């Protein structure tokens, strides 16, 4: 890669239609896990103008009012007026859930005992990543993109910018020099708005109240290109502007394109699905590698076969930044982390109703107390085993 290059990531707000769908799916998952933590859940959501469709496969003993959960989630996001794209009070909600296929269940149903040989719920490959670009050990472009739309939502909710509406998108381009963030080149922010706000006032407020307070001062060098609502108008938004579907923002959910993605979405899936749980474990492993000082960048790939507990492969790539060899780090990963599906569930305590919070602003790089995969609690053990000093202070 060139020594001087630009890299871009994007995020979307909680009011983006695909994120509305993700949040409904994870709200339903949480409600089910709160009653029956051994449920099998694959909850998919579609939302369009005035319509929400709930479908997928659910096997549970829980008694859940799915329609009310969907309405409550839409209300929490802020869609309480048809002018915004959907109204939680008046939208139709259709429910079409089946049970999990018994052919799949027979390979993963050993979850009620201490047998760690519970098989993976599907085949697939998952990635985890961490780097030292931010204190959260995340790539800078996706980190800033999330913080922009998160601030947009906060200013909308507290009334400081009352003309903001729930739907929004952000995009940040960072200039890298010698592999490190050097400066911010371009920021794009498109936000849904009330029809009576004029464009110059909107652009000034977004730049001064949302964008500038979010950007790190040490990365503001020269003129930054600010592109705010570049089409000129964004009144029609949310599910009215675009049909929303669960699982369509998988790059937003992870590393903003800075790392590969195995293709499996997260939201609506219980942790027996390795699409979700193994991706969380990959982040946990990668973050501990970087926090331990073993490397400044770490990419982990794991893969599984349906019904088989042991991963079919584990790979570590530190892109030449490792203080010990990638082979040594891979050996340490196998020694310190149980990457069998049941082992992951126990290691990260994943049978909890914690998932709705993950469904907007990124599954990774957020210091939420429920996000066990963000802990660096194995960094010291890894550092000691490798004979290096930890890169971050570890309690």
Swiss-Prot record:
Binding-site residues, L-methionine: 57, 100, 242, 273
Co-factor requirement: Mg(2+); K(+)
Catalysed reactions, semicolon-separated: L-methionine + ATP + H2O = S-adenosyl-L-methionine + phosphate + diphosphate
GO molecular function: ATP binding; magnesium ion binding; methionine adenosyltransferase activity
Binding residues for K(+): 44
UniProt region (Flexible loop), positions on chain: 100-110
Domain of life of the source: Bacteria
Protein name listed in UniProt: S-adenosylmethionine synthase
Organism of origin: Burkholderia thailandensis (strain ATCC 700388 / DSM 13276 / CCUG 48851 / CIP 106301 / E264)
Gene: metK
